[in-house]
Amino acid sequence: YGPRYSPDGSRVVYSRQGGGGLTGSLWSGSRGVFVMPAAGGESVEIAGNGADPQFSADGERVYFLTGGGLEKKLMSAGLHGEQPREVFNLKYVDHVAISPDGRSVAFTELFNGYVAPLPATGGSIELNKDTKALPVTALGTDMGSYLHWAADSESVHWMVGDRYHSRALAASKPDAGVPVGLRVDSDAPDDTFALVGGRVVTMRDADNSEEVIEDGVVIVRGKRIVAVGKRGDVAIPAGAREVDVAGKTVMPGIVDVHAHAAHFGQGVVPQNNWAYAANLAFGITTMHDPSATTEFVFSQSELVKAGKMVGPRVFSTGTILYGADGDFKAEVNSLDDARSHLRRMQANGAFSVKSYNQPRRDQRQQINQAARELGMLVVEEGGSTFQHNMTMVVDGVTGIEHNIPVAPLYRDVVELWRQTDVGNTPTLVVNYGGLNGEYYWYAKDNLWENERLNRFFPKNSLDENTIRRQAGPEWDYYHIEVAKAAKVLRDAGVPILVGGHGQMQGQAPHWEIWSLNQGGFTPFEALRAGTIDGARYLGLDKEIGSIEAGKRADLVVVDGNPLQDIRRSDDTALVMVNGRLFKADDLSEIGGKQRPAPEFFWQRGGGGVPTGVNYGPTVPCHCPKSDPHRH
């Protein structure tokens, strides 16, 4: 990772890191910082751990980062076996760039950039924007990523979204930025499909009717639905590929609005994501991740949009606007602070932000106001804090993620909430206040025997979360009580959405739908929560969420009838996203590019096992970024 040339171009320094949840652990045994000849040859270990290495101005030492979180250090080591020594204690600083002339250091701290002299001292110094040990100059606000120096050490560059920014040290402020201008065509299928003979659950005008078309026909041309109706009422175009779906149910693809999907990473971006495949195979065609590494998740999303990777539509808030402590916290003490954070996230591709446990109400209100000005959504972390939740409802956020930590809910809460447009994603699989819903569903099925999960899920991760299961008596599963409270809210007009929380990729959104049914939602109402209601929550209902002419062709074909037995919702036979049709059992493509079933690292000889990933009860869903220098 992070190879860099020495000043004279004769050597390259790089770090070796371990594997990850998307790449496996093969070749993870030898980690650290290494130097090798630029022309090729043997590598020499400089340090046993570290990341982001860079040469000193004379090429005789290497700087690198160690630690993680609030306990990071910038170290330096010679090229001939000298013991590494500390240069800076970093705490809130998350990126350091030494100038080519060795005289200055640029760094980012809590999403702002600074520059200071590089001292020639023998001891370690605390580096931060408020240090008294060095004169520190702010580079600008709305800072982004990839901070680096110009070759002459007279200016600093960085990226914010697709704009390349520069600040000359002699200038009073940064330039306006130059758009990089990289454009890639989005995937555009040109097939025409006719799905014939199935039961079509359209979710059209689903608040007022429960439209089901028996012996229906759905015509898809390219990436859009062009017609839907009964057989005989809809003409099948000449040349269309007819797909017999008699005896099956055709419904909109599932929209998971709270979908954590292995989106924490740095460095090389994997070009295959088994979490995407698992979700798509189970009929999830849209995912919204409300906590992810910004650069990583939007890179993955763009690979899907360009057709370079198979998966659902992927949207995200990027890194959360964290209100507690950490080197990624978002300090919000004014409306301008909030605007700065939201501008940065919007530039990177977010249309939503996650306001996460900002402790003061005025801070949360400032984020809300900035979002209104910028046309963005705000999804609030529920945080198991009832009093905060009620102020969130009053202040008018887009929605609250996770359940209200008390149930049942009484009339005062319901009457207050129904007068707003604030939604709720209860994430019953990880509900607050009692035994989680996921434990209930783990106990009901032998998931380690599920053929589809075994194809799309790393075997060791699947087994460790499904074989030895925690269980309790039926009355102890609190998610059912929470689901009943959600039903009361929905009957009062409060949008209730489906969020699988990444607990079991692909399967968890169905658990969420089934849990809503346990709370009193009819099968249609539970499916509505996972389709058109989710699309409306994300502001995407004009494009997805129902089967209507003109909308994007995101569909799932289910064996059986989930309107009669909601547990059939995960029995997917075919799935279509953006007009591309796949067999659900292996995700081989029908028509179009005719791509074969995807292959994953654990299916190859010596592919290793995933590391740094835990699905199920210990899912790490709010880590802001990976810590490649923590070992």
Regions found by a protein language model. Name each.
Residues Y1-G2, S6-F34, A38, E42-M75, ...:
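A flexible loop/linker signature enriched in serine peptidases of the S9 family
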Residues A275-E295, G311-Y322, Q346-Q358, N368, ...:
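Divalent metal-dependent hydrolysis catalytic cores, especially in the metallo-beta-lactamase
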Residues A206-M251:
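Histidine-rich, glycine-flanked metal-binding segment
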Residues G69-L70, L74-S76, H80, E86, ...:
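C-terminal recognition in membrane/secretory proteostasis and scaffolding
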Residues F88-V93, K129-H148:
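Conserved blade-ending motifs and adjacent loop-strand segments that build the rim/top face
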Residues V201-V217, K230-G232, Q507, T522-L527, ...:
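Acidic, glycine-enriched loop/beta-strand segments at the rims
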Residues T249-A306, G326-D327, D336, D362, ...:
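Metal-associated gating/positioning segment near the N- to mid-region
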